[in-house]
Swiss-Prot record:
Cell compartment(s), UniProt: Secreted
Protein name (record): Cruzioseptin-4
Propeptide: 27-28
Superkingdom to which the source organism belongs: Eukaryota
Species of the source: Cruziohyla calcarifer (Splendid leaf frog)
Length: 28
């Protein structure tokens, strides 16, 4: 199950990066 949690963390970080990118694109 630890591997599963690692996947969740990885996906979460990726999602955060995408959201931040979209927000930055929207502001400019």
């Amino acid at each position: 199950k630890r591997g599963f949690l690692d996947v969740i963390k990885h996906v979460g970080k990726a999602a955060l990066s995408v959201v931040s990118h979209l927000i930055n694109e929207g502001e400019h």
